[in-house]
Amino acid sequence: MEIITHPYSWITLARLAILILTAFLAWMTYQSNLLLKRFQPDFNLLLSPLETIVRVILVGVCLLLAWLTGLPAAQLGLSMVNPLSSIGLGLAVGIVIQVVVNLLTLEAINFFGRHIYSTQVIRNILPGRPLEWLLVPLALLPAVAMEELLFRTLWLGAFRDIIPLPLLIIGTSLIFGLMHLPQGSLGVVIAAGVNILLSLLFLWTGGILVPLVAHYTVNLLQVIVAHFQRDWLEEY
């Protein structure tokens, strides 16, 4: 019992669980990539009730693991300071990131060819009916929250004491990028770059709110931009 109640044992267990959770999500991403190559679903994956339930559960698991570490809320980025200004900063940064990402994506496709990017994911989650314009933004919330809690709160917060930050940021960015493999090699590279920026935002602001809002803004704007490029996507 003494071993179980020792604080260092709890944080070790939490770190092990974070590794297992990340490996599981990476495996699921790989399986999704294989599935999308063989099968194009005729329903919006983002709006699948089962997918949404799983994402909400994963958010809860991330919060549980954060608590299990026993680390201060400030180190995990879970203490809220000036939330309104943080939301405003996150929105501004998210808009800038999305503009840059959109330009880089188009330039890279024109230069390297269409084989470097897959439009399957974005075409699948595009709202097809007016009601889906309400549901898709809502469904993005747990998806973004789960990724931010995992890569910012858990990885940067719980491992920064034992892994040098530059190595931690690069390593998590590679994992984050590979989790976007269904979007093609370009999607992997861009996602890894965005993860580096979000990690720096987390460390600079000391909280998860700014990178979370920025991440959500990027994803939502990506859907909006794709809506106006629907014909191009269908012909891709």
What are these regions (language model features)?
Residues 22-26, 58, 62, 93, ...:
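Alpha-helical transmembrane segments of multipass membrane proteins
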Residues 1-88, 167, 223-236:
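N-terminal, membrane-interfacial amphipathic/helix-forming hydrophobic leader that caps
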